[in-house]
Amino acid sequence: MKLTPREKDKLLIFTAALLAERRRARGLKLNYPEAVAFITAALMEAARDGRTVAEVMHYGTTLLTRDDVMDGVPEMIPDIQVEATFPDGTKLVTVHHPIP
């Protein structure tokens, strides 16, 4: 299987997000990399599902709460940026304060 660097990045994000999802389901609080991967993967999937950029940006603020992550993690993530593939092309999505 030959993958481009971008495809490898997407697989790495997906793998980290899957691990984060499983840990969250077990009741564990997510650390910084897990929280970023969880949110990033959800944003990429929402874009693929056909949501608008504005919808994806709003959705990014609803995924995790302070109760879902370790202390200090929300302050470590002032924003998340991801190039997501929408039906009409790839666009940069920025979510400010993803963990309110």
From Swiss-Prot:
Enzyme class per UniProt: hydrolase
Main localization of the protein described in the UniProt heading: cytoplasm
GO biological process: urea catabolic process
Quaternary structure, from the entry: Heterotrimer of UreA (gamma), UreB (beta) and UreC (alpha) subunits. Three heterotrimers associate to form the active enzyme.
Keywords attached to this entry: Cytoplasm, Hydrolase
Localisation: Cytoplasm
Domain of life where this protein originates: Bacteria
Pfam families: Urease_gamma
Pathway: Nitrogen metabolism; urea degradation; CO(2) and NH(3) from urea (urease route): step 1/1
Entries under InterPro entries matching the protein: Urease_gamma, Urease_gamma/gamma-beta_su, Urease_gamma_sf, Urease_subunit
Protein name, per record: Urease subunit gamma
Species of origin: Burkholderia cenocepacia (strain ATCC BAA-245 / DSM 16553 / LMG 16656 / NCTC 13227 / J2315 / CF5610) (Burkholderia cepacia (strain J2315))
Keyword Hydrolase in record: yes
EC number(s) recorded for this UniProt protein: 3.5.1.5
Gene Ontology CC: cytoplasm
